[in-house]
UniProtKB/Swiss-Prot annotation:
Gene3D superfamilies noted in UniProt: CD59, Phosphorylase Kinase, domain 1, Transferase(Phosphotransferase) domain 1
Gene (name only): Acvrl1
Origin: domain of life: Eukaryota
Positions of modified residues (Phosphoserine): S156, S161, S162
GO BP field: angiogenesis; artery development; blood circulation; blood vessel morphogenesis; blood vessel remodeling; BMP signaling pathway; cell differentiation; cellular response to BMP stimulus
SMART domains to which the protein is assigned, alphabetical: GS, S_TKc
Glycosylated position list: N34, N99
UniProt topological domain (Extracellular) ranges: 21-121
Originating species: Rattus norvegicus (Rat)
Chain spans, region Mediates specificity for BMP ligand: 74-77
Self-association state and partner proteins as the record states: Interacts with TSC22D1/TSC-22.
Disulphide-bonded residues: C35-C52, C37-C42, C47-C70, C78-C90, C91-C96
The protein's name in its UniProt record: Activin receptor type-1-like
Chief location: membrane
Membrane-topology annotation of the record: Single-pass type I membrane protein
Amino acid sequence: MTLGIFRRVFLMLSVALGLTKGDLVKPSRGQLVNCTCENPHCKRPICQGAWCTVVLVREQGRHPQVYRGCGSLNQELCLGRPTEFVNHHCCYRSFCNHNVSLMLEATQTPSEEPEVDAHLPLILGPVLALLVLVALGTLGLWRVRRRQEKQRGLHSDLGESSLILKASEQGDSMLGDFLVSDCTTGSGSGLPFLVQRTVARQVALVECVGKGRYGEVWRGSWHGESVAVKIFSSRDEQSWFRETEIYNTVLLRHDNILGFIASDMTSRNSSTQLWLITHYHEHGSLYDFLQRQTLEPQLALRLAVSAACGLAHLHVEIFGTQGKPAIAHRDLKSRNVLVKSNLQCCIADLGLAVMHSQSSDYLDIGNNPRVGTKRYMAPEVLDEQIRTDCFESYKWTDIWAFGLVLWEIARRTIINGIVEDYRPPFYDMVPNDPSFEDMKKVVCVDQQTPTIPNRLAADPVLSGLAQMMRECWYPNPSARLTALRIKKTLQKLSQNPEKPKVIH
């Protein structure tokens, strides 16, 4: 069959080039044109004919060949359509065939299958389109549901599963910190999601111990153990989600970081509540503690050292399978530092925290419209000069705020029988609820810092604490101390401490 095709092609070529007999067209002498002649039968590079021809032929196993010549026979070949083997072109001006390029039809693989019904595409088209739309809709719905479940920490119902919790010996934690080894999530940062839901549903709220613009804090009871339940307001959902995300993905088990137990979205009194359940510390926040108590120097150092240890743990990146990214708090203040029963501090409220990993160089800022506390904002934040794409910038703002927390501790420390009432930083320079502009004028324009009590110079240990505050408040952020340096310096100042006492 293939041989027959090539015989026909050769015949057409011969006829086209005037090499065979056919229906003779007898043009007048005036109709003859000069043509380029490039084929095996040419005696000269120029020939004369009624028209010029170009024939592109592909023979089996060979590249397509181009033949040029004159035509005077079988003019109907000029009207033929190109095929996958031959393409014939005619023109009627002298040398019009010299630079003509032709193409063959695309090669078609012979098939012995019956021809497809012409109506089949009309039937299959709408069906396939419908299937694609259904698949895309299903995929979109699945992704939306998955995102919602991830935000709420709801992956399925566990029911009333039996739990085996082991009590922790650290601090005054009332609930077990860890599940048995074969039931942990691997993060060491809390209970698995499903267990968290069960714990949350078994917690009974006992009394409200604090309120703020972003929610309430309750003392709760779980199987006779006291827990703290932070109930977020609906407008602060992103803080709840962010804190839940960090606790569930980062290794944050540390004596000086508030112990996380569970997080859940629950319904109480026909309204949705966002719960964050943590260890309960009866002394409350450092802010509350300092208003009630005065401090001996060694207790002041104990509070300062433990808070610095917590901040240093947040700021450092730990590598390895049990590692953690570096974290900047972004809302450090005495209200977000809790006092444990052993008179050590632990840092709480990670709703604005920023995470950074050196290996991926990824800065995870989160998606929280809430801003930090204006009274504790560093000058570069107030004048909007902070580099938001640089993780170190966020750590430097934490150091500024930590210096203010140290100042609050120092005011309540007894030296030579003298102590001052508790006051918040800049109490004598701005209103009780300062605006952004109030703080910007005091800190950036007037370049003021809280007044350090002169009596600190009378104590060799607390004079070192006073110097540390000044180094936390440098206007140049990069010149401030690091959390690790603060921790080591405070530990050195508190060598050979006496047993701390609370003075009423």
